[in-house]
Design a protein with these regions (language model features):
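Short, flexible coil/turn micro-motifs enriched in small/turn-prone residues
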Residues: 1, 49, 101, 134-136
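Short glycine/serine/threonine-rich phosphate/pyrophosphate-binding segments
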Residues: 1-8, 31-32, 113-120, 142-145
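Gly/Ser/Thr-rich helix-start
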Residues: 2-3, 7, 24, 66, ...
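Short glycine/serine- and small hydrophobic-enriched flexible loop segments
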Residues: 9-12, 100, 118-125
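Active-site/ligand-binding loops adjacent to catalytic centers
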Residues: 13-18, 23-107, 111, 150-157
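Catalytic phosphate/nucleotide-handling subdomain of diverse soluble enzymes
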Residues: 16-24, 119-157
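Anionic group-transfer/hydrolysis microenvironments
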Residues: 27, 114, 138
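Flexible, glycine/charged-enriched surface loops at secondary-structure junctions
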Residues: 107-116, 130-132
Length: 157
């Protein structure tokens, strides 16, 4: 959320044809990439996951930073205006991205950017070789070391 907004600040005024902003949410905490409705959460109108009764829904993600039913109102504005698009990645996809990026680039992303790396891996084969992808690798994986060990059985040195 806020990390992406800060990162996008330098790119937001570029023409959408030249710079696409893609936000990646956790699959089971994804109000912007699903059919979530606008609701009030913590005093702000925002896209929010709700249950059948309109109450705030439960979410799940291995990533504590993405395990949240709402979204920044600014992300909602970017979605509604078409300036940004949002997708999501499952825990399994984020873990697979962590493994690949660690192996190929010797980068150990935290769980939050591992979701973004997952989208990068999905998107890259569809692009021209001259296209550039910039990923906000905003956190070190060491903070999620325990989760990586529980899920993968190891944490790379």
């Amino acid at each position: 959320g806020s990390s992406a907004l800060g990162f996008w600040n330098e790119f937001i005024d570029f023409d959408k044809k030249h710079v696409e902003l893609i936000g990646v949410e956790a699959k089971y905490a994804a109000p912007l990439s699903t059919n979530a409705k606008v609701a009030i959460l913590h005093g702000a109108a925002q896209y929010c996951l709700t249950d059948k009764e309109g109450q705030i829904a439960e979410t799940h993600s291995l990533s504590a930073g993405l395990d949240y039913p709402g979204s920044s109102p600014l992300h909602g504005l970017l979605k509604d205006s078409g300036r940004a698009r949002y997708t999501n990645a499952s825990d399994k996809e984020a873990l697979a991205a962590f493994k690949l990026i660690t192996k190929l680039e010797d980068i150990r992303p935290s769980l939050e950017p591992a979701h973004a790396w997952s989208e990068c891996i999905r998107l890259a084969p569809k692009l021209k070789k001259s296209d550039v992808i910039v990923v906000n690798n905003c956190g070190k994986g060491y903070k999620d070391k325990k989760i990586y060990i529980e899920q993968l059985g190891y944490y790379p040195k």
